[in-house]
Regions:
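Short SAM/SAH-binding signature in class I
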Residues: 237-241
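NAD(P)H dinucleotide-binding glycine-rich loop of Rossmann-like/cofactor-binding domains
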Residues: 57-64, 69, 96-170
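C-terminal hydrophobic helical "lid"/dimerization subdomain
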Residues: 227, 251-255, 295-349
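Short amphipathic alpha-helix with an adjacent loop that forms part of the alpha/beta core around
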Residues: 219-234
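Glycine-rich phosphate-binding loop and adjacent beta-alpha segment
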Residues: 188, 244-307, 345-349
Length: 349
């Protein structure tokens, strides 16, 4: 098959070995797949995957790795032991994991392990155990970005926001927008969004329901928080969703955050970063790194997208073919372009 292949630190579009469905696997024709910032992190920080003690990810420079973990596909084949739940022609998606020995041996992240090849190719293998059929008229591209929106759902659910608390979203990329969408679905008001890019700030409001937009080059988001809290006579703390992952940002938030803020670090891999425990202690902060999305978040968001109660498509700004992926990955590395770029590996643009 043709695919975007990572090998020895280089990304090329070429032929690679077709995936073969194993016991209980479905073989899919990839219909739509999205680029995520974690694809770039995986490429740029291979040492983290070479030395991943969990075994969930692995970077091997001497093996072809097909990245991509946000996808939807059409069933075109079955491995041994599959049921009849997903006939040929069924449109399916899945959480991006492959179970090892039915889960007894852990799991692999699809698109971040040579034994769990990803969706930046014409074909893809997923476990029947995690697959879910996609019915209805919802577009392939909307399904392809479910994973990103499940991230925001997970962090917002984990935050357990209380009356009087004010959410602050730092970064209006796909994950930041997903957090805005999850807050909006819960009727939270006000929602403060901070991003350097005016277009992304406006998308957070027009596409997903944010109320107050902040340009961090012009003013501190925490100054805005204090002003809003005073104007609305709210007594709750700040609940911060950090959705950027830039080096040094967490430490800056820790230093500037209001007393007793809760901080949810959704931005990704904080490679080599440090933070001041002294400042965090003085400010009485609660912090969470990673941990999701969980299946209830992922499949719950999928159900919402299929039902039409969540429309993630405003986050999609480009649809490309495989040949354009290397350039698009570089664009994502620079935090340029739309929040989500979607790929149609089989050419239906």
């Amino acid at each position: 098959m043709r695919a975007v292949v990572l090998r020895n630190g280089k990304v090329t579009v070429r032929e690679t070995t077709d995936p073969v469905p194993g016991q209980g696997d479905l073989l899919l024709k990839t219909l739509s797949t999205a680029i995520c910032a974690s694809d770039v992190h995986y490429m740029d920080h291979p040492d983290l995957a070479i030395n991943d003690p969990t075994g969930r990810s692995l970077y091997d420079p001497d093996r072809d790795i097909v990245m991509g973990h946000e996808f939807v596909g059409e069933v075109i084949g079955h491995g041994p032991g599959c049921s009849d739940a997903f006939p040929v022609g069924t449109r399916v998606t899945s959480m991006p994991i492959r179970l090892v020995d039915g889960g007894a041996g852990g799991l692999r992240i699809i698109g971040q392990h040579p034994e769990a090849q990803g969706s930046f190719g014409e074909l893809l293998v997923v476990p029947e155990a995690t697959a879910k059929a996609v019915d209805g008229a919802v577009s392939d591209d909307a399904i392809a970005v479910v994973d990103a929106f499940a991230v925001g759902e997970f962090y917002v659910r984990s935050s357990n926001m209380q009356p009087g608390e004010i959410p602050i979203i730092i970064g209006a990329g796909a994950v930041g927008l997903s957090a805005v969408a999850a807050l909006t679905a819960r009727g939270i008001d006000p929602i403060i969004v901070s991003d350097f890019h005016a277009e992304r700030r406006e998308l957070a409001r027009s596409g997903f329901g944010a109320h107050i937009l902040v340009d961090p080059a012009q003013q501190s988001v925490f100054d805005v928080f204090r002003q809003v809290r005073a104007e609305r006579h709210l007594a709750g703390c700040a609940v911060v969703f950090e959705c950027v992952g830039a080096s040094g940002l967490i430490d800056k938030i820790v230093a500037e955050a209001e007393f007793c803020s809760r901080i949810y670090c959704a931005g990704g891999w904080y490679t080599g970063d440090t933070l001041s425990i002294t400042e965090a202690t003085r400010n009485g902060l609660t912090m969470q790194f990673g941990g999701g999305p969980m299946p209830q978040d992922w499949y719950g968001v999928l159900d919402s997208v299929v039902a039409g109660t969540l429309d993630p498509l405003p986050s999609v700004g480009r649809i490309i073919g495989l040949d354009e992926v290397p350039e698009a990955l570089d664009q994502a590395r620079r935090s340029e372009g739309p929040p989500r770029i979607v790929i149609h590996p089989n050419g239906d643009l």
